[in-house]
Every structure is written in structure tokens, then in C-alpha cells.
């Protein structure tokens, strides 16, 4: 076989590294090339002189390697023989090991069989032991049962309740162990004997117990009798407990029966005192110690007393309901709560049973007496308040206060309501349920106060005159509108202050009640008070506004056609300024601590005056260009003055609110635009209409007709202008013009409805406007006919 060359050998990297380490000598360095080694040995020509010595050294090294190889070959010549011998020894050892394992396996099998036999024997012994133990136990129980039944018969005859109490529970428990053997004659016989003994014992025990308590012979023997009663099956214990409690409460049932005079609510504390004495005697006499502790005889006696008392009180209150009043009811409830607190302290809550509200709850059915009484009290309070206000006793005086203050009765009312709510929470065992009923009473009271004590005393402007006759008298005779006196103004401001305070307090009351009872709502009453503040403001506005009626009415009486030049402002502006300078500061002082209402007052006043001024302009007929210019100047003067009304004659000259400025500007800017339209030429209808739409884009045909009348345009020429206007704005040209509208439709939107807050002054202005519109060019006879028709319509309207 050809030996593999060195290049064919494939050795691992580790082997190659070891060989490399072994081959490194002084002249053998595998990691260097042959040329590098020669250059290292002979770096120069002069080093060639050492060639012989180096050759000798290399030959010496070769000889050492040969010797080493010869030694290795010699020492490893017999390696294969030793390996074969070692392999044979290993095989022999494996054979011996297999024999040993087989022997161990055989011995293990025999051991398992021995263990199974031993386990089977142990189980048989255990079964035998259990059977023997059960037999011995059964025999022992049977012995106990036999001797127990025999002894029990003797004890019953001797009335040895101590022994019976000790052994009877054990005998009964043992008998239960023989339930599976009741078919056995002996067990059935023993069970029958025991039943007869229990029946005899039950009758005898009940008789002896009652006799012992009736004769008062109390001893430890009674405790044994009670233990026997507890051990006996059936209702022996419960029947005796019921009899004992009835005996203890028999006197109470007679003394405080519902037909006895002492049973009425005014003496309810006597019945509670009686039971406290009875319970004290019960414990002092040691009765609580005679009965077993688990009977809780004191607690059960108290519970029965509460039940009996609750039934008696319900019957007597039902029978004498007409005699109930809430103070008597409150007296009884107060003593009942005190008694229940005493019971709760003596007998704390146990097993979910408590004496809290044990009797108290019976009164809840009759608390409508409290509700009715509070309704009566509050109604009387409201009547008293109204009487005081009417007599002047309640009215605040201008001398005592510089500004309006709430009526003292408003604070008294809320204090009374608070007292009612507090009382209700003390009376009912379910206070939330009663408070819900009380809230209804509170709401009625608030509404009653708002109506009878506030609204009823708001001055009614023009109350001396009413109906259509009054309206026509104002038109024909121009009767002066009645004004409020300073005291009446102060009263109105006080009513406003009272309503505002009541509204804010009602909100606070609702928040407090909602914390306790979610869903409480008295917002309607709050809104009623806020509505009164608005009505009060309206009365003040109408009063101050009426001072300017004469000045506004004078506008339509001026012959504006004859005005040929523009001068200073017209007299009516000065008149209005003088009246407002006199009236507004007084109202401001009266409402000094309620600035928001004064601001609202100014807004209403300025807005209504501005609209009235526009209405007065519409009633002017045939205004010349100079007349329109004069009115334009007057309008600017009026606007400037109205913007200064909130701070008129005030030390502090503050800027008016934005809403106020916007409202005044909007109303009087329209007046300026109307006057500018009046100044426009009507030579060309289309140009006039375009100018009208430009200046008054939000106008309508009815308003345009009034503007034409202001310009003095003849009525027969109105149709052409109005039709052009309708075509321009896209309306139908076939609609009838304003002059053909029925009188009924015209007054429907102008007259105030009955019961509204509109004043007679507003009605006057509306009537004058329509009278001027409809009667301007009519004959006297026709005017009278139309006025009669108009009067009939007004009567129906009012």
C-alpha cells in the first residue's frame, strides 16, 4: 500500500499549531521562508566566512532529530498490542456487569410481590379495626341510649330538671346517630319511649315554669328548666317566651290601652317611663340572669314593647286624628326619639336588629298634620306681611335709607322657611320624604309672597282711567298722564330690591336642598322674582317716560312746512332734557346698590324714548326741507343727550355700556335716515325709491307710505311710488296699499294686549298714529263714523 504523502494529510488547526511549536529550532523556523532564513544567517558577504561553522551546527541539529525519531519509534512499537489487551478486559467487565444487573432485576420483582402482599394484609387489618371500632362505638351509643332513656324516665318523675338539662341534649344527639337503624325493632321501641317522655316532659315543664313565675319562686332550678325547654324540640321555648312577655306587659296593655285617657300623645312619656321601670325591675330582680344568655330575654321584651306601643299609638292616632296638631305630634316624637336612644344604648345593634326608629316610624303616616299646619302658618304670615305693607308699617322710608332696600318681611319669610325645613328633618323617621312635601309648601309660599306682597303693591300707572273711553279722552282732550310720587318711586325700587334679593336667596336655597335631595327645583319661583324685577323696571321706565309725552306730542303739532331756516334745537328737546335731568338721578340714587338694574333701566328708557321719537316723526305732516333739517339737528341733540343719561348730573362721568350705545344709535340713526329721505327730491320716482332703499334698507311699504305723508305727497300719488318700491325690492305689486288695510288689522299689532305691561301712554301713541294715518284727509262726518267703529274695536281688544 502506498503511503499518503504529507500534502494529503489533513490535520486539525490545533495539531498543526502544536507541530509548528515543536519544529521551531535555531535553524528550523517554519514560519519563515528559506530565503529569509538564509538572508538572516548571511546578511553580508563577510558573514560567508562562517559558512562552515553553520553547516556543522545544522548537521548536529539533524543528528539530534534523528536520535529523537529513533527513540519515538522504539517506544511506540508495542502500542497496538496493549490496546487490544485493554479492549478485551473491557469486554469481560461488561459481561460481568450484565450478569449483575439481571440478578438485581430478579430480586426486585420478588420484593414487589412481597410488598403487595404486605399492603393487602395491612388493608385487611385496617378494615377490621374500623369495623371493630364502629361496633364498639355503636354498642357504647346504644348503652348510652338505653341508660339515658331509663334515667330520663326517672328524672321526669322526680322533676330533676338539672339532670335532664345535662343529659337530654346528649340523649337526643345519640338518637340521631341511629336514624339509619330505625327499622330495627329495638331502636324503634327506644325512639317511641323517648317521644312519650318528651311529650310528658313538655306538658309538665310548661306547667312548672308558669307556676314558678306566678308564685315568684325564682331559683337556679328555673335556669335548668329553661335549658330543658331550649333542648326540647318544637315550640316549647317560643311558647314560654311569648307567655312570659305577655305576662310582663299585661299591666301596660291595660293602663295604656287606646281607649284610656292616659294613652294620648300628651302623656306619651309616661308609657316610656313605665317600661324603663319595668326593665330596671327585670334586671334588678335577677331575671336577666335566670334565663340563658342566648335567649336575650331583655332584648326580646323590649322589642315586644316597641311593637305593642307602635300598634296602640297607630290605633289611637287614627281614631282621634281630628285632635292631632303638629306641636303635640312633635312632643310625642321628641320623647320617642329620646326613648329609642336610651334603648339603642342599652341594647346595641345585633344581627341587623336595632331599636332605632322602632316606634318613631309610626308617626310618619300622620305628618300631613305638620304640612297643613305649616301651610296655615305661612298663609297667615303672608297675610300679615301684606297688611303691614298696605298700612305702611313694612314700607321702607326715604328718610331712613338713601337707597332702596328689601322689605324686612322677605328675610323673615326665609327664616320661617328655614325653620319649617329644619323642623321637618326632626319629625320624620325618613326626613327626605317629608322634606319633599315641605318643598311643595315652600314653593307655594314663595309664589304667594311674590304675588301678594310684591306684585300686588306695584303701582298701576293710569289705573284711574281704563278702557277705550280713556284712550279716546286722551286723544281728544290730551289729559296729562298721572305720574308716580317720589314715595311711590321709592316703593317700586324697594319692591325691585326685594324681588332681586329673594331670587338670589332662592337660588342659594335650591343649592342647599339639592345637596341633600338631588333634583329639587324651585327655578320657577326664582324666575317669578326676576320677572317682578323686570315689571318694576317697566313701571319706573313708563313713569319717567311719561314726563316726555307732552314734548313728544308737541312735535306733530308744529307746522314744519312753515320752517324756513335752521336755528337752535327745538323747545321739545329742552323740555325732555329738563324732565330727564330731574327724574333719572333720583332713580339712580334709589338703585345705587343695584347698579345692574339701573343700567337696565337706562337702556329701556332710552330705547323706548327713541322709538317714541320715531313714532312722533311719522305723525308729522308735510315737512319742508328746512323743517327736516331742523328735525335732523334735534335728532342729533336727542341722541347726544340720551347717550349721557346713565351718568347725568353724576360726580363720576363713566362711559355708557356698549349695548346701551348700540341700542340708542340704532333707533335714532333710523330717525336720521327717515329725515334724510324726507329731504330727498321726488321729481323722479325711481331715483327716490333707490335713495329710499339705500337709506332705509330694512324698511317696508307701510313705513314708506308714512314717509310719503311726512313729505306731503298727495294720497293719490302714493300708489305709483309704492308700486315702484315693491317692484324694486321684488315684492308683488298687486298687494293692497296701507290705506286700504282694514282698521282691525292695523290696531292688532299696535295696541297692547290686555294684562301686558304696556302703559296707557303707549296705547295713546298707537291710537294717535293710526288716527292720523287713517283720518288725515277725511271729512268730519267720515271721521266720526270711523272713530265709532274704532272705539268698538278697541273695546273688544281690551
From Swiss-Prot:
Protein transport is among the record's keywords: no
Q: Where in the cell is it found?
A: Golgi apparatus, trans-Golgi network membrane; Endosome membrane; Perikaryon; Cytoplasm, Perinuclear region
Record keywords: Cytoplasm, Endosome, Golgi apparatus, Membrane
Q: How does it sit in the membrane?
A: Peripheral membrane protein
Q: What happens when the gene is disrupted?
A: Mutants are viable but display reduced brood size and enlarged lysosomes. Egg-laying defect, slow, but coordinated locomotion, and reduced levels of unprocessed and processed cargo in the motor neuron axon of the dorsal nerve cord.
Q: Which Pfam families does the entry link to? A: VPS53_C, Vps53_N
GO terms for biological process?
A: negative regulation of dense core granule transport; positive regulation of dense core granule transport; positive regulation of locomotion involved in locomotory behavior; regulation of brood size; retrograde transport, endosome to Golgi
- Tell me where it mainly resides: Golgi
Expression by tissue: Ubiquitously expressed, with particularly strong expression in neuronal cells. Specifically expressed in head and tail neurons and in the pharynx and ventral cord motor neurons.
Which cysteine pairs are covalently linked by disulfides here? none
What GO cellular component is one of the record's annotations?
cytosol
Gene3D superfamilies associated with the record: Vacuolar protein sorting-associated protein 53, C-terminus
Record's keyword annotation contains Membrane: yes
Q: Enumerate the InterPro entries for this protein.
A: Vps53, Vps53_C, Vps53_C_sf, Vps53_N
Complexes and interactors: Component of the Golgi-associated retrograde protein (GARP) complex, also called VFT (VPS fifty-three) complex, composed of vps-51, vps-52, vps-53 and vps-54. Within the complex interacts with vps-51, vps-52 and vps-54.
Homology family: Belongs to the VPS53 family.
Biological role? Acts as a component of the GARP complex that is involved in retrograde transport from early and late endosomes to the trans-Golgi network (TGN). The GARP complex facilitates tethering as well as SNARE complex assembly at the Golgi. Plays a role in the trafficking of cargo to dense-core vesicles, probably through association with the EARP-interacting protein eipr-1. Important for neuronal function.
What's the protein here called? Vacuolar protein sorting-associated protein 53 homolog
Organism encoding this protein = Caenorhabditis elegans
